[in-house]
Amino acid sequence: VQNILMKNLTDVCVGTISWWAFGWMFAYGPIEGLTKFAGNTEYFGHGFMTETSVGVIVPTDKPRDWFFQWAFCSAAATIVSGGIAERVNFPGYFFYTLWMTCIIYPVVVAWTWSGNGWLQGGTEQNINDVGYVDFAGSGIVHMCGGVGALVGAAVVGARTGRWDPEREGEFDPHSLPLIVLGTFILWFGWDG
């Protein structure tokens, strides 16, 4: 349990800094130049404030959007922690989180959600046009996290010393009250 909790905390802490520094830029920054690979401006929060004609600096809506999208980014990174639980050391997981929240997830978002990406062509109204349609992150968030967990589990292999081939059975949960509390928190978060 401590291993997974520490990895989830790492996802949030490292993910916040890397999403702020470069992730947002790759995902939602304006794409300048000939490529539609990923955004290449607005790193380190540039573009979150703007100057008016009278020289007053005022906030834009981007910090709100940044926070909302950061939550999706952290969720995608956290999905992997269950797939490689108790098998990856902390420095290895730290660099995975940095890579996922700074490069992998933002580039996938740039291709699909940003409005500038090469997969952004189809909409629900125009289904014959080739493009990507996603509902609430089902493809982007969960696919990035799921593929990351699959690759991670394949690379690190099975847990040693945890499985007994002679005795098959289910593991008892660590704390049933915490499982129920977590379920209620998820329900509350989903319902608003």
What does each model-identified segment do?
Residues 1-192:
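Hydrophobic alpha-helical transmembrane bundles of multi-pass membrane proteins
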